[in-house]
Swiss-Prot record:
GO terms for biological process: formation of cytoplasmic translation initiation complex. It comes from Drosophila ananassae (Fruit fly). Belongs to the eIF-3 subunit C family. The keyword Hydrolase does not apply. Residues 195-209, 894-906 have a biased composition (Low complexity). This is Eukaryotic translation initiation factor 3 subunit C. Component of the eukaryotic translation initiation factor 3 (eIF-3) complex. The eIF-3 complex interacts with pix. PANTHER family: EUKARYOTIC TRANSLATION INITATION FACTOR 3, SUBUNIT 8 EIF3S8 -RELATED, EUKARYOTIC TRANSLATION INITIATION FACTOR 3 SUBUNIT C-RELATED. Residues 242-270 have a biased composition (Basic and acidic residues).
Amino acid sequence: MSRFFANGSDSESESSEEEVQATNFNKASAFQFSDDEEEVKRVVRSTKEKRYENLTNIIKTIRNHKKIKDIPNTLSSFEDLTKAYTKALPVISKEENGITPRFYIRCLAELEDFINEVWEDREGRKNLSKNNSKSLGTLRQKVRKYIKDFEDDLSRFREAPDQESEAEDEEAAQDSDGGDAGDDSDAGIKREPAEAAPKVAKTVPAKAAPADDDDSDDSIDWDSDSETETESSDDENQYQNMRERFLKRTTEKEEKDDDKRKDKRKEQKIKIRKRPEDDEDGEWETVVKGHVVEKPKMFEKDAEIDIPLVLAKLVEIMSARGKKRTDRRLQIDLLFELRDISDQHNLGTAVSVKIHFNIISAIFDYNQKISEPMKLEHWALLLEVMQSMLKLLLVNPDIHMSESVAEEHEELATSPFYVRGCPLAAVERLDDEFTKLLKECDPHSNDYVSRLKDEVNVVKTIELVLQYFENDGNNNERCRIYLRKIEHLYYKFDPEVLKKKRGEIPQNTQTSVDVMDRLCKFIYAKDDTDRIRTRAILAHIYHHAMHDNWFQARDLVLMSHLQDNIDAADPATRILYNRMMANLGLCAFRQENIKDAHHCLVDLMVTGKPKELLAQGLLPQRQHERSAEQEKIEKQRQMPFHMHINLELLECVYLVSAMLLEIPYIAAHEFDARRRMISKTFYQQLRSSERQSLVGPPESMREHVVAAAKAMRCGNWQACANFIVNKKMNTKVWDLFYESDRVREMLTKFIKEESLRTYLFTYSNVYTSISIPSLAQMYELPVQKVHSIISKMIINEELMASLDDPTETVVMHRSEPSRLQALAMQFVDKVTNLVDVNEKVFDMKQGNFFQRGNMGNRGDRGYNRNQDGNWGGQLRDIKRIRGQRIQRGRKHQQQQQQQVQTIDEE
């Protein structure tokens, strides 16, 4: 029979049956398969086999690229490897309980070694092409960043790189044979026990050895068992079309294979993950990552545990500190175990304190990069250990812990105890780590709120250190810990302070202002370093300004002379100074000191970079204005989000203060060519708005202030107040103030007063006299207030007028020129300046081209006159022009005097 028929029998009856069946099939089912194709067992592979095969293929590709140093392709293959591992994570977490396969760790270790080898070869790097060099740097950064999550696995692998676990052998076997399990029956038989071989031979025909002749099909030894023939014929009858042949078949052998693999894997996992409490002897250890790591033994079984032995073990553990291949997590675990052993054998509190301090140092050392924040589990552990150590120190006052105690002078056995260490440095580092954690979080997320809740524990730890140093510490240490306490307190608003001012609570109630006074005054008296004292003064001023103690804050600024030497301070202190000035300006604004508020804020706002000056963010810079290292340093100096000052509030207060000062000044010096600008920023905003041909309704905060300024120039206080105090501005700005209603009332009052002053400056030349009650009614002010404002203007010689008390009127003197006269005088001044400039240009063009030595010789004069023109006539013209200019000036002065006399007579 032909080999293309489904059944390989020589029987004519079977062949006729096949022909009858073939006539009933459609064209799609008419395709038949050869005997070789029937022998191939089609099996759908599991997801694990697919994922692992993909990983191994990429790893082989990476190794090939490393051999020829093809770095760009190595980079692309590494990216493919990370993506493939990400896809395989669900399988790994399900099948391996999250244990990273050893072959994957081996690949990462080899890749890291390859990169380090190429990177350290400086001569070889110089010979690399531009593409290879660029790819090497990118690959190095990506690999170093990626392997951070596999540090523990890599460290264990490097300790025993040649050790192969049973799990890796099984994975390697599955990776190499998983894809060919259905094609090679011998491979499947080899993985089975010897007893299962006969059954497999019955169900799966063995593949014969290859023969030299072409008729190898005829030499196949078929089993003559009738059951096998029946089964094979039944199998052939089952597949009536192509689709059914490719559906997965689950044989009895495969089911047994799967069951045995699962049982073996379960036994292995149970052996690895067995808990100590499940064993009677308690000798089993929990292994985190896949294979057993033997922990170093602390002491011998029959060793006598005493203080020297524990200290020797402590020195042994800490001697590995900072070394390259030190397992930092294991080091922390060993220290905790040593602490427990010390407590079990009652070796004393001093030994426990020393071990606590070394645990704190080990936790700090876990993160090698100082600029990066520590992990959250380490942070929680650090807080717990720190507070535990400080409580031990407070309960046992006979323990003296100081960095001045040398190692050989430590006393841990008898009281008084002396322990080497510095809890102050530890709590300062703890505070810095807390700030890093806050900066790392998104300020608008719940993580930031969760981290911010830890500030309670940080402040509690600082309080414990403060109590310890108040009992046992020098002035320098107390000043340092007081400053840490101040830095957590100075920016927080305490409503009890204002209630105490109003008498709503007893006067003996201690508020945050009282605490700040006590801490800062101690630093003022005892500190011998300028930095701590300066920062304490700045924080003290900030806290006073936040609680509206304007005069105390102002006096501290003036008496300390901070503004004279702040430029020599460190960047962190300068940032605190900028924050203090910003808050002082807000305080002055709330206390109705508009001019002082403007003076405090002008230096911050005129630069256009208040965000950077207050360390609340970085502005986008041009390409070469800031290097990457400078940007990194500036980011480290940024303030946490909860300490930020609202920049829009700050700018609005500055612009409103500038408006209240600038608009009356512009109206008073409208025709003064030499008038100065009070606020350059506000003046630019006003001029840019005036240059626009079409101005729409205001939308932003700046547009509202500019529109209010235009209304104030006309004396329209109601429109001005509506632009400044409205629903949109309340939401953006004014509601951010404590007691915002009082601030809005203060703003409305100032707008009325400055609008009145602007009105009098602008229209004083129109009125002969004006009624004070009419002005009071127009601006909704008390008559006494209007009288006071006008009196001040007259005294300061801003308004040329006099008050007539019987009639309650203001009589204008009209001593100032009218608008037309002022414009005419400006025109005369400009024409005079133009004439002077033209005369100077004329003199420069004429020059002196004759020799001064021959001026007395008439012949030479005649020669010069004939050759270059009449120079004598030119001199006469110059004298005549100068005489005319002097006469015009005298006439102009006489005319002005006559005008003044005429005005006085009228």
